[in-house]
């Protein structure tokens, strides 16, 4: 395999579309322009897309279909389109600047705001891990009849299992998990054929926004939170740094374009899976000939009861197959969640932990509320906790989204690759709508809570003052991020060079090695 060494650099360039450098664990993208280069960029988008088909998504999809049939499909469409735009911006930030979102936040904000953003990001990682914990517990319950609360405790051991499997190579493990996850997707596609949802109703639900019935707004926010996750923005901006791309204007543009295409393909698959789950749940649970037993399951549908939806496809094996895929979904999401947690801690605090320790700490924080709810409320309570976790993610999204939008619109950070006026307008409209929906739901729900409360007047007043103070603080924090001007500093001096001129920059070996827990990490200068 022919290779050449770039002048004045240790970087190897090859005509092969995909090379992994064993010394740095980075994937090298050749200088020569070719459509085959696209294969060098495959990976980050699909890793990120795992979060869109995790147990939290399955839970919210199942409940929205069972309760509102196809009425909330438009949320999936809007969220998927928004996710594609937002995730592409996260990838662009990493590609253009050579730093991921958390590192930019550390460089941009003073100590107190930076620390608060780190805390919020860590809460988002833990909230994302809660559905994985509960989903895994449900899977163990279906496979081995283990009580849910014991299954929650056993999820703490998944860290050791994952570390053992990762010795065979992280990519092989991810391929196996992706295969199992898409097995359940195939089952839902086939079940979609058997359940025969009305195409007109499905299309109407996809393209006509509607929020009818009690709880529709809350479930819509849960769907939004399950689709557009804050930790994914940190994750995507860091994963792209594992590629050593030509640092020319044309090389960067090519990388951004290919990452957009890859993200589009990955999110299209995730979109089809989510639409299929909602459509199957809506068609089966709203059928006129539904048995009393299945109707009871639909009224309180969660991951632990959903296997009956696959009965037409795999018969008596439906619960086992669903459990295996649910287990795979939870564990694959655990891997990406671990990466996101590492990048968040490294970026905000310049602190790195061993992957097994990082995973264990996050999992312990997620186990505590999951265990309490599972003991008190059983599987039904655990299912509701998934919805709450998704809502938390939605409320935390602005604290990752606003910095991302401001950084990618900054000429000093992105140079000629900064967002255009159209892209900036579209992304700020998307962000504004998300924040507006969250604030409306938060205020209206809190007012309803106060009006229908049976507490005495003093307690209601105290709770009202406390609650509205919290809402005011939330709004003030978002306003600070939106209105604050970016620092006038640039780390992208190479962007002013000609299209053909290439500058070699320090490879992000620290980022590449963070994805390979079994190898020694390189701790180097981030600049």
From Swiss-Prot:
Tissue expression per record: Expressed in the vascular bundles of shoots, cotyledons, young leaves, sepals and petals, at the top of the flower stem and in the style. Expressed in the peduncle of developing siliques as well as in the septum and the funiculi.
A cellular component annotation (GO) from this entry: membrane
Record-level GO BP terms: cadmium ion transmembrane transport; iron ion transport
Keywords: Ion transport, Iron, Iron transport, Membrane, Transmembrane, Transmembrane helix, Transport
Transmembrane segments: 38-58, 71-91, 115-135, 143-163, 173-193, 221-241, 264-284, 321-341, 364-384, 385-405, 427-447, 458-478
Null allele phenotype: No visible phenotype under normal growth condition, but in presence of Cd, increased tolerance to Cd toxicity.
Subcellular location as annotated: Endomembrane system
MF GO annotations: cadmium ion transmembrane transporter activity
Pfam assignment, any one: Nramp
Sections of the chain in a coiled coil: none
Main location: membrane
Membrane protein topology class: Multi-pass membrane protein
Lineage top rank: taxon: Eukaryota
Function: Probable intracellular cadmium (Cd) transporter that participates in the distribution or availability of Cd within the cell.
HAMAP family: NRAMP
Stated family: Belongs to the NRAMP (TC 2.A.55) family.
NCBIfam families: nramp, Nramp_1, PRK00701.1
Protein name: Metal transporter Nramp6
Organism: Arabidopsis thaliana (Mouse-ear cress)
Gene this protein is translated from: NRAMP6
């Amino acid at each position: 395999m022919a290779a050449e060494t770039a002048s004045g650099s240790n970087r190897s360039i090859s005509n092969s579309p995909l090379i992994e450098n064993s010394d740095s664990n980075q994937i090298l993208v050749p200088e020569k322009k070719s459509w085959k280069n696209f294969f060098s960029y495959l990976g980050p988008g699909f890793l990120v897309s795992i979060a869109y088909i995790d147990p939290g998504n399955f839970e919210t999809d199942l409940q929205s279909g069972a309760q509102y049939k196809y009425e909330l499909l438009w949320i999936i469409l809007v969220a998927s389109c928004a996710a594609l735009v937002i995730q592409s911006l996260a990838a662009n930030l990493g590609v253009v600047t050579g730093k991921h979102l958390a590192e930019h936040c550390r460089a941009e904000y003073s100590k107190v705001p930076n620390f608060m953003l780190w805390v919020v990001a860590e809460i988002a990682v833990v909230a994302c891990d809660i559905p994985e914990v509960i989903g895994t517990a449900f899977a163990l319950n279906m496979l081995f009849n283990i009580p849910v609360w014991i299954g929650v405790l056993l999820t703490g051991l998944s860290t050791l299992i994952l570390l053992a499997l990762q010795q065979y190579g992280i990519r092989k493990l991810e391929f196996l998990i992706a295969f199992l996850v898409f097995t359940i997707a195939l089952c839902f596609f086939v079940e979609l054929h058997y359940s025969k949802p009305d195409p007109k109703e499905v299309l109407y639900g996809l393209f006509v926004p509607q929020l009818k019935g009690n709880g529709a707004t809350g479930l819509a926010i849960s769907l939004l939170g399950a689709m557009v996750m804050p930790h994914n923005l940190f994750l995507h901006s860091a994963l792209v740094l594992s590629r050593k791309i030509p640092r020319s204007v044309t090389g960067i543009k090519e990388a951004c374009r290919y990452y957009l295409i890859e993200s589009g393909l990955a999110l299209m698959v995730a979109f089809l899976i989510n639409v299929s789950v909602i459509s199957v749940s809506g068609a089966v649970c709203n059928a006129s000939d539904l048995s009393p037993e299945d109707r009871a399951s639909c009224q309180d549908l969660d991951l632990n009861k959903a296997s009956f939806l696959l009965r037409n496809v795999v018969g008596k094996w439906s619960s086992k197959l669903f459990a295996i895929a649910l287990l795979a979904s939870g564990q694959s999401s655990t891997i990406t969640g671990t990466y996101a947690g590492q990048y968040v801690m490294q970026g905000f605090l310049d602190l790195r932990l061993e992957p097994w320790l990082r995973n264990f700490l996050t999992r312990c924080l997620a186990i505590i509320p999951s265990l309490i709810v599972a003991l008190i409320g059983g599987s039904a309570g655990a299912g509701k906790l998934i919805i709450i976790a998704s809502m938390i993610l939605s409320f935390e999204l602005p604290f990752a989204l606003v910095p991302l939008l401001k950084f990618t619109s900054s000429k000093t950070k992105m140079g000629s690759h900064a967002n255009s006026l159209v892209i900036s307008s579209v992304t700020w409209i998307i962000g504004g709508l998300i924040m507006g929906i969250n604030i409306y739901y938060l205020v209206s729900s809190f007012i309803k809570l106060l009006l229908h409360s049976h507490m005495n007047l003093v307690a209601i007043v105290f709770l009202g003052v406390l609650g509205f103070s919290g809402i005011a603080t939330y709004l003030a924090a978002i306003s600070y991020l939106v209105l604050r001007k970016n620092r006038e500093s640039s780390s992208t001096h190479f962007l002013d060079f000609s299209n053909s001129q290439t500058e070699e920059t320090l490879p992000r070996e620290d980022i590449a090695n963070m994805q390979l827990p079994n190898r020694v990490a390189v701790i180097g200068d981030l600049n």
